[in-house]
């Protein structure tokens, strides 16, 4: 997910996307710990997506 895509979304949409990504991160961590995760790059990708969403949320909050 690109930052430009996130900038176009509303705060409510960003919060919903953040919850979705946090759930995905939890599931990936559980799969990794049990040895079921084959695509380990998804953990890093999800973590960075969460950081991007949080950054955009903070930027939007600072402009208000």
Swiss-Prot record:
Tell me which Gene Ontology terms the entry assigns under biological process. Answer: translation
Entry annotated with the keyword Ribosomal protein: yes
Instruction: Enumerate the SUPFAM superfamilies for this protein.
Output: Ribosomal protein L29 (L29p)
Q: List all membrane-crossing ranges.
A: none
For this UniProt record, the keywords arranged alphabetically read as follows: Ribonucleoprotein, Ribosomal protein
Q: Which family does it belong to?
A: Belongs to the universal ribosomal protein uL29 family.
Name of the protein in its database record: Large ribosomal subunit protein uL29
Recorded source organism is Teredinibacter turnerae (strain ATCC 39867 / T7901)
């Amino acid at each position: 997910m690109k930052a430009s895509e996130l900038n176009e979304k509303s705060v409510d949409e960003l919060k919903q996307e953040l919850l979705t990504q946090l759930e995905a991160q939890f599931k990936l961590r559980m799969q990794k710990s049990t040895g079921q995760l084959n695509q380990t790059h998804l953990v890093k990708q999800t973590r960075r997506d969460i950081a991007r969403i949080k950054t955009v949320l903070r930027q939007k909050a600072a402009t208000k």
